[in-house]
Amino acid sequence: MSVFRAVSQLTPARIWDGVLARPLHADRVTIGFVDIDPGVLVPEHRHDNEQVGFVQRGSVTMTIAGQSRELRVGETYSIAGGVPHSARAGADGASVVDVFAPVREDWKTAPTVDPFPGRWPEPSR
C-alpha cells in the first residue's frame, strides 16, 4: 500500500447504520475519517482503544462517561480506553476525524462499500 493516499480513495467501512468510516491503519494507530448521517445515533459502546478526535463538518452531540456536549466544527474530544460513549449527529450530519491507539482491529473486518468521494475534499493537485 502506498504511504500517500487521498481520503476520498480510502475504502469506506460501514461501522453502524448511517455511519461510514474510512480507516487508515498504521502499525500502532488507526485514523478514521467518519461520516455520520443527519440525526443518526452511534449507540453507547466502549473499546480498549484510546480515542481522540475533532469535528470537521456539521455537529455532533457526544456523551462520554455520562457527560454530554454538542460539538461543532473545530472542537475536539478525548476518550480513555474502556469508557462508555455515544454520539448523535446534528441535523446536517457530521464528519469527524478519530484517532485510535492501539489499532482498531475490528474495523479491518467491517463490511465495506465501494469508495466514493463522499464529504471529504479531493486533492487540490
Language-model regions, residue ranges each:
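A short, N-terminal "cap"/entry segment at the start of jelly-roll beta-barrel domains
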Residues: 1-28, 109-125
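Conserved short histidine dyad/triad with adjacent acidic residue
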Residues: 15-17, 32-46
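Short, conserved beta-strand element in jelly-roll/cupin
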Residues: 35-37, 47-62
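Short acidic-glycine-tyrosine-enriched beta hairpin
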Residues: 66-81
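Ligand-binding loop in jelly-roll beta-barrel domains
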Residues: 81-106
